[in-house]
Amino acid sequence: MEGFFWKTLLVVGALAIAGTSSLPHKPLIYEEAVDLAVSIYNSKSGEDSLYRLLEAVSPPKWDPLSESNQELNFTMKETVCLVAEERSLEECDFQEDGVVMGCTGYYFFGESPPVVVLTCKPVGEEGEQKQEEGNEEEKEVEEEEQEEDEKDQPRRVKRFKKFFRKLKKSVKKRAKEFFKKPRVIGVSIPF
């Protein structure tokens, strides 16, 4: 009978130890997650300047113990410090006309090791594009007026000039779009 008691106690103890689950990652509060995301951006983006957190609003759904996906939303601004200097972000002031980046990130805690994916793009980009388009339209009007002044040129020359202006405008627009694509960074996090 005494042997049965010890065997039962041993089995119950083994089940109790095996039954306790530990998280595959350490609990991560929202502020730590955002700080980690900014640090990852600074180390992996290829930018010359460091970026520092400007604003982050904790979502109501953030669960530091969750094993599911978690979402981040924050903005950061370019600082006067260069990446090559390897200085602490607390020492770096914001650039007066520094770029403000709007970022969305996802932590995938279900992966082993956990993975974070960040997508950042300049804030106010759409407003700048509209302003640039307005400026380009003004330039076109000026160019058309200039063409009218050059009435003594053959019609063929005018058509070629107009065609090449449109081509130049299209190339500039596509080049700007290409270089303003959002930066996407994905890394695994060793916890």
Swiss-Prot record:
Expressed by the venom gland, stomach, trachea, skin, muscle, heart, kidney, lung, brain, intestine, spleen, liver, and ovary. InterPro entries: Cathelicidin-like, Cystatin_sf. One of its GO terms (cellular component) is other organism cell membrane. The keyword rRNA processing does not apply. Pfam families: Cathelicidins. Residues 1-22 form the signal peptide. Residues 134-151 have a biased composition (Acidic residues). Residues 23-161 form a propeptide. It is found in: Secreted; Target cell membrane. Keywords: Antibiotic, Antimicrobial, Cleavage on pair of basic residues, Disulfide bond, Fungicide, Membrane, Secreted, Signal, Target cell membrane, Target membrane. Residues 126-154 are annotated as: Disordered. Disulfide bonds join C81-C92, C103-C120. GO terms for biological process: defense response to bacterium; defense response to fungus; innate immune response; killing of cells of another organism. Belongs to the cathelicidin family. Potent antimicrobial peptide against most of Gram-negative bacteria, some Gram-positive bacteria (Bacillus) and some fungi (C.albicans, P.pastoris, A.terreus, A.nidulans, and C.globosum). Adopts an amphipathic alpha helical conformation, that may allow to partition into the target membrane. No hemolytic and cytotoxic activities have been observed on mammalian cells. This is Cathelicidin-related antimicrobial peptide Bf-CRAMP.
